[in-house]
Amino acid sequence: MGVYFLKRLEEESSKSIFDSFDLFIGTSAGATNALMLGMNGCKIEDLEKFWTVENLKKIMNQSFIDKTSIFQTRPKYSNDGKKEILYSFFENKKIGQSLKPVVVTAYDLEARKPILLSSYADPKIPAVHAANASSAAPIYFPTASMEDGRWLIDGGIATNNPSLIGYVEAKKLFSTNNIKVL
């Protein structure tokens, strides 16, 4: 969800986003937001600091050759700027260190299927790797090489809107029928 929407929701409810939800799920850029909220219990101001124009320029930095080339022979952006920004927020934390359950989507190239990286099933995955994999959009960013040898790309390839997955995961985790998805 967009940071602006989350900010408005927080203002209207007079309750922090972290306190309003029991599980955070996201795909691509939303995966980074979900990880930041679930792992750090961050405030909306922290999300706004992450998604500044300055950070976006670092994330989407191109070499002069890539900017002037007629043909694209490699991903448009490197992972260097993206990983630098991700490390500045997550440091070396693993997703299992989250304060609330977090799920991010990705797509496994070898298995040819969507996958979930979660704080409860994959606790040892570095948060930076999870965020990088879920946002490794083909053509734009390189494929994410995981520590276990898997090659992952942007979760939006198969699950652009992870709401239903969030509902199913919440049903598994919480013993209640009172589940609301936003």
Which role fits each region the language model picked out?
Residues 1-182:
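Patatin-like phospholipase
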